[in-house]
Amino acid sequence: MTNEKVYSMPFGRVYACLIAKVERKGRTRAELDCATQWLTGYAPAEIRRCMEDGTTYGDFFRRAPGMNPNRSRIRGVVCGVRVEEIQEPLMREIRYLDKLADELAKGRPLEKILRSE
């Protein structure tokens, strides 16, 4: 799938899949919203609005109110690719959220996921 296809996908559809993934593993939407807020600066109500108003996945990240400066601490593999090695900045931001959702689903404590140290 090309980057442009990913960027043009409806945010609501993608985020619903992330919610389902974490809930299948016993985590909550509130925890995913918290991780998303940490990464992007969107409040939970704004995340819901973006899900409902047709915002694209690319625009969700392009318009993020405040990307967390500690996001570069997110490391690891998502879909066989190291997130820290992704060259295209927007795709790296998208994969950061994928990685946070993966860590939630794997049972990692939220405090560690948010890399507040």
Place the predicted regions along the sequence by residue.
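A charge-rich, low-complexity, intrinsically flexible signal that marks solvent-exposed coils, linkers
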Residues: 1-117
